[in-house]
Amino acid sequence: MKKLILLTVAATLLMACGNEIPEKFWESDKLPEIYPDYTNVTIPVNIAPLTFKIDGKADDMVARLTAGNEEVVYGGGQVQPDADEWKRLAESAKGDAIKVEVYVEKEGQWTRFKPFNIYVSPDSIDPYLSYRLISPSYVTYEELTINQRCLENYDESVIYDNMLCSDGADGQCINCHNYQQYNPDRMQFHARQNLGGTIIAYDGNIKKIGMGNDSILSAGVYPTWHPWLKLIVYSTNMTGQIFHSVDPNKIEVFDTESDLIAYDVEKNEVTNIENDSTEMECFPFWAPDGKTLYYCSAHFEYKDTVGKGKEFLSRTEEVKYNLYKKSFDPETLQFGPRQLVFAADSVDKSATLPRISPDGRYLMFTLAKAGVFHIWHHDADLWMLDLQTGKVRSMDEINSPDTESYHSWSSNGRWVVFSSRRYDGNYTRPFIAHIDDKGQGSKPFELPCADPDYHRQFLKSYNVPELMRGPVSIKPQQYAEAIKREAIPVKYVRQLQKQH
């Protein structure tokens, strides 16, 4: 519905940055179509300025942002607040909202759309986010970096560039960056193929570990740091991929075998903690109390012990991962037997990527029809398990019709950042959502950029978004020098023992 509004010049001629609110306009009861869609989202008080533009054809746009006594008017087709303006607006709206009014001109006629709010939570978010930037392809994986972005502004820097140690046929791939308790000074990532090894940085010291050993299935893959011990649990995976010609899921990444191992960073010792040949364990994650390890596992028994690969490909739809946990004693470093947490196979689904909220109350995971690598599954959604009540539900308020996959909690447990392919089904972008004390999520918002159209023009996917308390200070060249060293081989032990 539209109605014509005519206001006096004295009441409406608001000026800011040379922009004016139009005197005469039609009024619409519809929300404006803007990109990114920041209508009625909830944001942390310390987030970088939200920029947006009209998503469609328009001759001009004017927007007024109001919070308390603060008011700013923007024009020129897009809203790009500077840092000082945005900070004043956010501080004035903390615990409340920034009111946004958008006026659009088409063919000489102005329309004022239904105002919307940007709710400003007093809950802050960790100031840094790291991720791997990679083309959504299996061909150009060498041209990738691990980057870090300050969430309080638009500053971005490279933690490590994969091409620093790649040399023609001697290619390399880096992956699986991970931190101990959001601490950027305690980090690990893997270098694969040429000069391969696991890089571990701990309070300024960097070492390269050769984790391959005859007593374990493979070198470590997906990691999780213990909250305070110098201990990392990894999955070990024999991984393959196939390409579909008809299925809407273009690529299927799968494990034919996988186990869990524990690695003592200080003693350089490794041991198996789950290696049942009929179970495929993956994606471990520590509970914040350091006394429980969560992971997912699929039961799969081969009928043909010789042609495993071909058999697995013909039975991929049978592979359903459930969620499990194991108790752990931090004093003795001993694990208890596994316990079932959520039987996804009972509803003909597959659950992966368990992540526990910092207060230990909620377990967020990714659910899809089958398989383990849900980033390639268009039906993948985020689900939440209340560990106190046992209730499990789909996070409909966060999910989209396309892929939602990897997710990371903020250190205060009030935010999650997650990977989504909601725009085009191909490129993975980071979205952020507020989670209240009842486990309810808010409408998610896209990572803000200085140019509102940046992500639609950027031809890389954001892979494995991880929040951090600050920036990684080690320079890319320092990591490159460590990668060029000989790897220190791990020692296999039947049982880890605490050093006294």
At which residue positions do the language-model features occur?
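Bacterial Sec-dependent N-terminal signal peptides
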Residues: M1-E23
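Sequence signature of WD/YWTD-type beta-propeller architectures
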Residues: C17-H500
